[in-house]
Amino acid sequence: MFSLNSSTIAFSIGNFNIYWYGVLFALSLLIGWYISNNIVKQLNNFGYSNLTLNEFDSFLFIGLIVVIISSRLGHVLFYDFQFYKENPIEIFMIRHGGLAFHGGLIGLMIYVYLYCKKKSISWLLLLDVLSIAASAGLITGRLANFFNQELVGKIWASEYGVVFPLVDTFPRYPTQLYEALTEGLLAFFIQIMYLNINKWKSFGTGRYAVIFGIVYSTSRFIIEFFKDVEEIFITNNLLLTVGQILCILMFILSLILYSIGNRKISESI
């Protein structure tokens, strides 16, 4: 059995505290930026894109703001609306945790579509680039959830359980680590393997976005059964969480994206 520290502070500078959540969240953004920049650079070298790195960095900077705002709004609206309705000031307390992936995804996809339409750039190509960066960033992003002791698993009477002292004294499933390994590492590994096979020619087909969408939605749907989150009734015999419902929609969207990519490939032949 493993127990986390009761403090979420990584280190302090004078009276200013630096939290693990902020450190790891910033690291996830840095990893995503580094990987996406290198992909765009390679695409330019092979003639698959004319998007300059300066343009891409500007796109990412605004995209980051969009993702943070939409992720926070997603958490507020999807998961704990009543609490934030009664405590509106807490909406701005991001350091307490509470960024919903699906909210960020919705905001980012809208931003990508509008940006690409304005710049006459392939939106599928940008989605592919961002999907690989997102899967890599999610590895440390879920570690941020782990050290912030949020999104914890159900009580698990096992020597492999983890105690989150800010929650209670019971060992629980470390579901954040499960998600880091599947939504992050597994999705990234499959995408890189597909990239090695196709030698960059598959960018702009939406394939990497589809791989990420399917791996993420499937793995999170399963892991949600082990999370200590409120379930909602769908039928008399089936209980699903809000996250699982959003994952079902994400899976369907991935299949639609696959169909769109296939149609574009057929038109180019």
Where are the regions that the model predicts?
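Hydrophobic, membrane-interfacing alpha helices
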Residues: 1-269
